[in-house]
Amino acid sequence: MFTDELQIPYVVTKNKDEKDNYNRISPTFTHTDHQFRLTQIIRQEVGNPLLELFGIIRSDLINGTQNFYQYIINHREEVNTAGEGFTILNKFDFRNKVIEMFSSDNFSRNLNYVRLIAFTNDCIGFWNTFIRDGVLNNPQGMITKDDMFTAYRTVFDEYKSPIIINSEDYIVHDVRYYIADNGLACYCITLRSAFDGKVTPMFKIIDFWDSTNMNNFGTMINAIHYKALTGTERSRWYRYFRFKDIHLTMTDFRLNSANKNRLVAKDIDYGYGITCHKSQGSTFENVCIDLDDIIYFQTKWGKRIRRNPAEALRLLYVAMSRATKHAYLKL
């Protein structure tokens, strides 16, 4: 098992009787003959002030203390002569830093130059829209050439070959608007992998900006899922998953009550901002972290509440340790 036990477990077991299961690791990883534990950060060079922050976070997690928050209140910025380190920014200055980083030539030449990281999907949705439409000026359509995407699951073609791979980054290579035979409005696109430059086969993404189109999509997927749920044919689930693999979505979709209100998770999304969980395993030169979104959450009544301290520190540890050079935090 290769893992850092102070970060977010890759796989957790679900127990409906327990409220806090974010740190309950699957027995798949704990009941093994050989285990390897990561205890040293290896992304940053010696002398990077980030390393001291990581040490404080690790100590807090081990000892149940909260020294990290006091430290960043007293040390708003620590940067070495190479420009490596961390900076705590207010809301206005953080926004300007995001604009500066994502509009720079460094980002256009190197997609791993910077990434924005937060905890909730809503926050990531806000920042993806802000960066794409406000910074990069791509508001003319839902998908345009050179848009950046991150895959949220691996999708296969009918021959079991992967079209897109979970967590990989892509750039839109070609795009055209298309009305499918079933009447659904889609974007037919090919993507260029940011990893190896290979171009994917063409595939379809549902136009979710069109509410009528999404209603039609909902009617279809609910009907197909209900047949799979209640039917007896051996191929019923194959037809459902084949429909999903042909019609990809950029937004989560909730099935109706007849289908037990199950959530159909999105397949792909803009990749300028990603969640802490999605970032795990990735490496970027710089990260912009919405620390407010990690420390606090909002109840359905609109009340702002502190997140579980240990959970927040684990999320923050993952987000900050993605950077090889500099972390900018909004607080």
Where are these regions (language model features)?
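Substrate-engagement module of ASCE P-loop NTPases
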Residues: 1, 5, 25-30, 315-320
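Helical mechanochemical/support elements of P-loop NTPase systems and associated helical scaffolds
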Residues: 1, 34, 46-53, 123, ...
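Structural recognition of the conserved hydrophobic beta-strand(s) that form the central parallel beta-sheet
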Residues: 1-4, 37-38, 329
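Short beta-strand/turn micro-motifs composed of small residues
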Residues: 3-4, 118, 291, 331
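Conserved helicase motor core of P-loop NTPases
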Residues: 6-166, 173-227
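Hydrophobic beta-strand signal
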Residues: 150, 171, 285-288
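C-terminal accessory regions
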Residues: 185-331
